[in-house]
Amino acid sequence: QDGKRIIGYRQALTLDHKPESMIVVGSGAIGSELAYFYNAMGTKVLLVEFMPTILPLEDEEVSKQVGRSFKKAGIDVMVKSSVESVESGEGLLKVNIKNKKGEIEIHEAEIVLSAVGIAPNVENIGLEELNIEMERGRVKVDDYYRTNVEGVYAIGDIVHGPALAHVASAEAICCVEHIAGVHTEPIDYTNIP
């Protein structure tokens, strides 16, 4: 990612212009939402997904319905496909995509948006100095977001679970209610929209 033409979701939320064309790599919640948004704004969108369906973590019925809606809206979708390389130079980016037949297709776009996952922001924020326990690159917490250090809590993309804004908001409410002594139930991550 260069932050200008090959971007992540954070840059996609703050672009200062509407791109004419965009290839979105990854069709999870964030990739699908941004593909839909930019398409609605008039950008020609190609959505590329490695898995056999878009929204691969959702129910098959949901995935199929969203796929039909995307097709009707004019969003091109390639499943069982992967981006092999991106060539930048003057003009449009050239994106080499291996399709489901194993053949390389070359597509061009003004912007390539990588939405294949969120890296937790755990570097240089003082976790080491506090001896916060980590687990697979994220802060280890209990059901109420307590860390192993008394009085230190963690929510959002630095803990395990979906790295989505509305999930972090729900985690914050659960955490703060617990701190305040209000009886609260832990979040059920199997029922997240």
Predicted regions and their residues:
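FAD-site-proximal beta/loop scaffold in flavoenzymes
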Residues: 2-18, 107-184
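Rossmann-like dinucleotide-binding cores of NAD(P)H-dependent redox enzymes
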Residues: 13-14, 19-23, 29-103, 163-169, ...
